[in-house]
Amino acid sequence: MAFDDLRSFLQALDDHGQLLKISEEVNAEPDLAAAANATGRIGDGAPALWFDNIRGFTDARVAMNTIGSWQNHAISLGLPPNTPVKKQIDEFIRRWDNFPIAPERRANPAWAQNTVDGDEINLFDILPLFRLNDGDGGFYLDKACVVSRDPLDPDNFGKQNVGIYRMEVKGKRKLGLQPVPMHDIALHLHKAEERGEDLPIAITLGNDPIITLMGATPLKYDQSEYEMAGALRESPYPIATAPLTGFDVPWGSEVILEGVIESRKREIEGPFGEFTGHYSGGRNMTVVRIDKVSYRTRPIFESLYLGMPWTEIDYLMGPATCVPLYQQLKAEFPEVQAVNAMYTHGLLAIISTKKRYGGFARAVGLRAMTTPHGLGYVKMVIMVDEDVDPFNLPQVMWALSSKVNPAGDLVQLPNMSVLELDPGSSPAGITDKLIIDATTPVAPDNRGHYSQPVVDLPETKAWAEKLTAMLAARK
């Protein structure tokens, strides 16, 4: 099932028993964020949360943790809630091959029901804003998709970017936005500022789950998130035209903010509790001026709790990081078998591969660090043999324990790029990177004395299936 908006997704979650509606009156702070934080601490099957009785707000409706469990992630893809994680990733890979699917342009989006312009805009009246962590420097929009275009090639649909970037609400119509240098919006901004121009943007809030997943997926610069969203949902993705910028935005969004990133203007933004589980400090960041707001009557506001993993962002970004990294590596190295980059947005990646010759696994690890995502994120790579499942951590630990000799299997690369939010980088944005080669050496590499590995007996698979069926029959 393809969801055209957030509301139909919430209904599906409710139908599957994966939406908890909190009827009691709650405080915006700390209850909303604390409840979302708690979903990551109660184990498997954490539900989405719905709040509509929030002290101090009139008619506020807030959804949290909508993709914050593997069950919810499966539902977002139209899969049964009990679909195993590896099968969800395999399905993501299968659908990826459908790219591109052209979007469907629709008229009469619900977000056009109400509009506010210019100095009449007051985001504090329109949005039920609250802090997510007690050390945050202000209110944040952290699950919105930001649409921007290449100023030098504005009609190139593929170069129109849809990405998720945190934004601090700093005034009635002013935001602070962090454009990470490795992301497409930073390239768009750089081109605009070289010309002395503001960068027009459209910000979409309360989105369907597929475009949210796409906003967190590191595609190539000229790959369209809308065309990939169509591939992932297996039907054309619905878009509409934003009235001020003329940009393509999701047809089903709850709220559309349009304005500009003001050229060469910077102000202190932050701190903010980040996906790394640490606060990013206050830094000079770009300033956004909002010139037009369009919104549904009684819009649903959605926010994303971030903190020490796992939280919703880890479910959101995990498969969305594994799959493009796998596809980009597989295109150049067919020997690559699987990529697990689910941990902290791929700051650590585990890659299994066959080997053509000695040193081959390290070459794959190096390439992972220079993919579009790897330049800013992949800080450590663990390379394992093709018979090791990178999603099976006991197998990975076995490979590390039995195959790694620190004398020759650690490859340290000094002074490499990483996103500034990496708390271990020094200075911010610069780090050493590490490849751990936990593969069995092959010629001409003759280090170690590896005998033939012990493998499962031929009958093991059949017995595993038989025992699983017997256990299921007892329940």
Curated annotation (Swiss-Prot):
Coiled coil: none annotated. Prenylated FMN binds at residues 161-166, 182-183. Gene3D superfamilies: UbiD C-terminal domain-like. One of its GO terms (molecular function) is 4-hydroxybenzoate decarboxylase activity. GO terms for cellular component: cytosol. Binds 1 prenylated FMN per subunit. NCBIfam families: UbiD family decarboxylase, VdcC. Belongs to the UbiD family. YclC subfamily. This is Phenolic acid decarboxylase. It comes from Escherichia coli O157:H7. The gene is edcC.
